[in-house]
Curated annotation (Swiss-Prot):
Gene Ontology annotations of biological process type: axon extension; negative regulation of axon extension; positive regulation of DNA-templated transcription; protein K27-linked ubiquitination; protein K48-linked ubiquitination; protein K6-linked ubiquitination; protein ubiquitination; regulation of androgen receptor signaling pathway
Pathway(s): Protein modification; protein ubiquitination
Feature: compositional bias, Low complexity: 303-313
Record's keyword terms, sorted: Cell projection, Cytoplasm, Metal-binding, Nucleus, Transferase, Ubl conjugation pathway, Zinc, Zinc-finger
PANTHER family linked to this entry: E3 UBIQUITIN-PROTEIN LIGASE RNF6, SI:CH211-59O9.10
GO molecular-function terms, A-Z: DNA binding; nuclear androgen receptor binding; ubiquitin protein ligase activity; ubiquitin-protein transferase activity; zinc ion binding
Biased composition (Basic and acidic residues): 1-10, 17-29, 88-107
Biological source species: Homo sapiens (Human)
Name of the protein this chain belongs to: E3 ubiquitin-protein ligase RNF6
Disulfide partners: none
Length: 685
């Protein structure tokens, strides 16, 4: 008994030093963490505003107590060295980078490039390569957090160093695009926007290569300033492109982007101008990338979906079938639709007065919220008397992309009432607009004919949210495929309307209007039925997307109609559409994600510019500050003299790095929950 008791006493004596050592180590660790926290706050307090924003915008601040001041200094020095090698990204000065390596790996992504401009705020970058010159400008408005990206691209028509000679490329099928992409890899531009695409671009004065498929450059020896604006010739019979996508086998692309709307409107008034525009909306601001497309020769392609029962997969609508407009040259068509179209989903059909051509370049729809606009303009005209040779004005294919976050509450009508059919018909001369709203997606298609120029507009409004700065959306993501599906659905509707017009023009006995109306009715019913299957509520969004993705990857045999001129549909994987650049404009969708849950009312964070506009001060240990409070409610730490604080409009104060991180995901005060910028501003932010 005594021996066992002595052994137990000895064991307890052994555990006492171990417990003491454990507590000592824990106390030492806590003390070191406190020292690191103090050094952290001291480092933040000593940073000037520019260095603080630089580290914050690059997510280099870390967590207090887990990172040392030495590591913070190393991070700051590292990012400064990185920006020193590219001063244009910081101070907005012009930077000629004609000697940038062609295979620069860190500039091969349009997403990465645009992200760089978005992080750095105001910046201007320009460069030249051969006959290519480009200039990219990014601007931020600190008052409202608007971001605008503008890419200006021009081509020197006399310098054809990168142009492909010959006309054989017009016979390459669309399915050979990947092979064509590989064969021409070495001929790409050095612009970071042009990397990872099948595009071969030539640019001149203040331009840049862009992520756009190739189309043939119509160069007939024009001078550099006027080469893109041919005023001679007439429209070639036919239109190139497949459901709003330029064919991969067309040769070259002419680009022109205009930083302001007035400049863009002025250029659109020039006769024979070939233009397209891609507008990126972020935080309620529009950025634009305008693309001018001049085609030398294109095979006639009909932009139409050939199946009677439209597939749920809009990818089936991208391959082109034959589209003829030879009869249009001698007899312009003036059609009106007076009959209501009733279909599932909320649908309205109405006619409106012709609009000025200048308005078509931006928001040519009767709706005020943001939109994705795919516009295909067909120009017709006789040969100019000033032309000594038969130079034709070729079809103009214009793709407009406008994306903006839809404010909470705009899509609350996703109930049974919103899915009922409501039609309306008005009177006008030559404009037809169809609107459908189902499952939160609003799509419109319009047709306008004015002075021999016919414009088809397909508009898609998609509920979006901006993804985090460091998050990259995989091409196989459900959200990106949802956006892709909606875009292709709109392209299919657009092409169906165009073919309806084409077929109606073939009938000169006065029965073309019923045929067109029949096409529009079938279009609305079939597409709306597929949209209804996609899910009319966000609760089924993920399941619907998964089902539709499975359908997108399946190769189905299309149902051909009576016309022998309608070719079969060629299905392609949506991943390849994004990766190979068949739809390069979809890379811009990487900035956005579809709302995959019913959280339209969820309030999101403030922009960096809105956060920076809030007042700051240094904490001082005096009677006034003692009355206001000594503890940051975010990190639950006491204020120390010299701490940099940010004050909200409600007069609550926090550590600047603590509240900035909070406001990046929220727009209310952590204490009183009052909106920091007001409900309207916060929602728009």
């Amino acid at each position: 008994m005594n021996q066992s008791r002595s052994r137990s006493d000895g064991g307890s004596e052994e555990t006492l030093p171990q417990d003491h050592n454990h507590h000592e180590n824990e106390r030492r660790w806590q003390q070191e963490r406190l020292h690191r926290e103090e050094a952290y706050y001291q480092f933040i307090n000593e940073l000037n505003d520019e260095d603080y924003r630089l580290m914050r915008d690059h997510n280099l601040l870390g967590t207090p107590g887990e990172i040392t001041s030495e590591e913070l200094q190393q991070r700051l020095d590292g990012v400064k060295e990185q920006l020193a090698s590219q001063p244009d990204l910081r101070d907005g000065t012009n930077y000629r980078d004609s000697e940038v390596p062609r295979e620069s790996s860190h500039e091969d992504s349009l997403l990465e490039w645009l992200n760089t401009f978005r992080r750095t705020g105001n910046a201007t970058r320009s460069g030249q390569n051969g006959n290519q010159t480009w200039r990219a400008v990014s601007r931020t408005n600190p008052n409202n957090g608007e971001f605008r990206f503008s890419l200006e691209i021009h081509v020197n028509h006399e310098n054809r160093g990168f142009e492909i000679h010959g006309e054989d490329y017009t016979d390459i099928p669309l399915s050979d695009s990947n092979r064509d992409h590989t064969a021409n890899r070495q001929q790409r531009s050095t612009s970071p926007v042009a990397r990872r695409t099948r595009s071969q671009t030539s640019v001149n004065f203040n331009g840049s290569s862009s992520n756009i498929p190739r189309t043939r450059l119509a160069s007939r020896g024009q001078n550099p300033a006027e080469g893109s604006f041919s005023t001679l010739g007439r429209l070639r019979n036919g239109i190139g492109g497949a459901a709003g996508i330029p064919r991969a086998n067309a040769s070259r692309t002419n680009f022109s982007s205009h930083t302001n709307q007035s400049g863009g409107s002025e250029l659109r008034q020039r006769e024979g101008q070939r233009f397209g525009a891609a507008h990126v909306w972020e935080n309620g601001a529009r950025s634009n990338v305008t693309v001018r497309n001049t085609n030398q020769r294109l095979e006639p392609i009909r932009l139409r979906s050939t199946s009677n029962s439209r597939s749920r997969s809009p990818i089936q609508r991208q391959s082109g079938t034959v589209y003829h407009n030879s009869q249009r040259e001698s007899r312009p068509v003036q059609q009106t639709t007076r009959r209501s179209v009733r279909r599932r989903g909320r649908t309205r059909v109405f006619l409106e007065q012709d609009r000025e051509r200048e308005r078509r370049g931006t928001a040519y729809t009767p709706f005020s919220n943001s939109r994705l606009v795919s516009r295909i303009t067909v120009e017709e005209g006789e040969e100019s008397s000033r032309s000594s040779t038969a130079v034709r004005r070729h079809p103009t294919i214009t793709l407009d992309l406008q994306v903006r976050r839809i404010r909470p509450g705009e899509n609350r009508d996703r109930d049974s009432i919103a899915n009922r059919t409501r039609s309306r018909v008005g009177l006008a001369e030559n404009t037809v607009t169809i609107e459908s709203n189902s499952g939160g997606f609003r799509r419109t298609i319009s047709r306008l004919e004015r002075s021999g120029i016919r414009t088809y507009v397909s508009t898609i409004t998609v509920p979006l949210r901006r993804i985090s700065e460091n998050e990259l959306v995989e091409p196989s993501s459900v959200a990106l495929r949802s956006i892709l599906r909606q875009i292709m659905t709109g392209f299919g509707e657009l092409s169906s309307l165009m073919e309806a017009d084409s077929e109606s023009e073939l009938q000169r006995n006065g029965q073309h209007l019923p045929d067109m109306h029949s096409e529009l009715s079938n279009l609305g019913t079939d597409n709306n039925r597929s949209q209804h299957r996609e899910g009319s509520s966000q609760d089924r969004q993920a399941q619907g997307d998964s089902t539709e993705m499975h359908g997108e990857n399946e190769t189905t045999q299309p149902h051909t109609r009576n016309s022998d001129s309608r070719g079969g549909r060629q299905l392609r994987n949506p991943n390849n559409l994004v990766e190979t650049g068949t739809l390069p404009i979809l890379r811009l969708a990487h900035f956005f994600l579809l709302n995959e849950s019913d959280d339209d009312d969820r309030i999101r964070g403030l922009t960096k510019e809105q956060i920076d506009n809030l007042s700051t001060r240094h904490y001082e240990h005096n009677s006034i500050d003692s009355e206001l409070g000594k503890i940051c409610s975010v990190c639950i730490s006491d204020y120390v003299t010299g701490n940099k604080l940010r004050q909200l409009p409600c007069m609550h104060e926090f550590h600047i790095h603590c509240i900035d991180r909070w406001l990046s995901e929220n727009c209310t005060c952590p204490i009183c929950r009052q909106p920091v910028l007001g409900s309207n501003i916060a929602n728009n932010g």
